[in-house]
Structure formats: structure tokens, C-alpha cells
């Protein structure tokens, strides 16, 4: 059975990692010196945090990396018992081979409970001579300050367009795909700097056709073209509520989009709208209110229709 492309084309070593050149340079220095502090990787999903941790372990340990590296997903195992059992049992044993220390990688560590984080802090202190921790999180503010102060913090930003394009073209060439310019632009738009999402969309589109086009990408990603969103917002802003609502329903039915997806795309269009700064502020407030109501369980169609109605009377 074929691997998902995100795993098939995951970089094996630090020099292969796409983007984040300054971060990779610092991690490479740790490998060369065989010495490093505890690390905290923060950033949005799909920007290379897990890949960097795995590549670091493989470069540091070589063939014995599996014996000296433990990966746990904290969103699945987020309680204090995991820290007291799995983490502590692995941390207290000596490294295999000539490795100076073991590495424990806690993915999504911002999901750990407060008690678990306090237990982790004590474990980090107790076994710091033979074990290093790499913590990965989306929201560093959810990591308690005592842990943050014990780590070197690396902030992974969304990947640049040129890095995404280069990697997508490389994968397309290896998979003998024809990647059209419109297809690339569409993947860049829907992925928003998330390499994992970009590769998944490319693989899904490739299952439909060997030629990846703009239309196919938006279909498989369940996203509307930016011009479809622009058309709806312009109709609403010009007071054409009925036509705007019809466009909204077409997006939800024809494209299978959720209200949240449409709201995010409308929000992304706000800076480009030909309205005053004051009107943009009021529009963002209305979008925020609509988002809150949808998250709380209100009917998506009613809330989005109300948003379109408000857009027609912006002051």
C-alpha cells in the first residue's frame, strides 16, 4: 500500500528540510557539537516542527535513532500518568551506543494538563544529564513559564510561497504529474503556508487527474475560488442582498463548504475590499460576531445571511 505523500517525501535529514534556514542552521550546530538544551518548537500546524525534530534525531544518532528517541502525541496522552510512566521510564535509562543523551519529543505539548506540565518540569530537571526534551506546540502561551524558561524557543513561521512551490514541483516531477500554474496558485491559496496541507491537496488532486488544474484543486480542497468570494462580498456591499445570499447558498451546496470555511475566506478578502478603513473595522467586528455564534452552535446559513445583510448597511 502506498504511503501518504507527506510521509513518503518527509525530509530525512536537517539539510533536506524545506525553509526555516536560520532554525535549521542552529539545529545543525547542536548536532555537530553533540550538545543541546531542551527545545520548544512553536508554530501553526504543518510548518515543519515534527519534521525538524525527527531529522535532528536521525542526524544526531544515525542508525540508533529509534532506540534513543521517543515520540509522544500529548493531545492523545495528555494526563499526568503519561509523564509518570512512559516519559519517566524512557528518561531514566541510559542512551544506546555513544549517544550523549536521549531525546523525548512531545508533540502538541500545549494539550498537556497543568498537572502534567508540572510533573514534566520536575522530570526535565531530574534527568537533564541523560535526556533532552523537544516540545512542539501551536500555542506557546499554554506552556507554563517554568518549562518555557528551561527551553531554547524556536518559532516556526508559515512557509514562504517560493519554498512551497519548489517542493510541490519536486514532488510532481517524481510522481510524473503535470502541475499547471493555476493549480500551483490554488494550492498555495488553500494551504496558507502549511506544507502538510499543500502536499495532501496535491495527492488528492493527483488521484483525480494526472494534470493538476485550478478547478480540481478547489474542488478537492472544498474551497471556493477567491473570485467567487469576492463576487459574493461585492454583491452584499452594494446592497444586493438576495443575489449575495444566492451566491452564498451556491457555495455551501455546490462546493460543500462549511460556514466556518466561508467565513475564513471572507475574512481573508477584507484587506482587499474597496471600502474605507472604518467600514473594514466594522466588517471584521461583524465577522467575529458571526464566527462566535456559529461556534456556539447557531445555524450557519442564518448567521452568514445576517452577515451579508450587515455588509449592505455598513457605516
From Swiss-Prot:
It comes from the Archaea. Keywords: ATP-binding, DNA replication, Nucleotide-binding. SUPFAM superfamilies: P-loop containing nucleoside triphosphate hydrolases, post-AAA+ oligomerization domain-like. GO terms for biological process: DNA repair; DNA-templated DNA replication. GO terms for cellular component: DNA replication factor C complex. Coiled coil: none annotated. GO terms for molecular function: ATP binding; ATP hydrolysis activity; DNA binding; DNA clamp loader activity. ATP binds at residues 43-50. Heteromultimer composed of small subunits (RfcS) and large subunits (RfcL). Belongs to the activator 1 small subunits family. RfcS subfamily. Part of the RFC clamp loader complex which loads the PCNA sliding clamp onto DNA. This is Replication factor C small subunit. It comes from Methanococcus maripaludis (strain C5 / ATCC BAA-1333). The lineage of its organism: Archaea, Methanobacteriati, Methanobacteriota, Methanomada group, Methanococci.
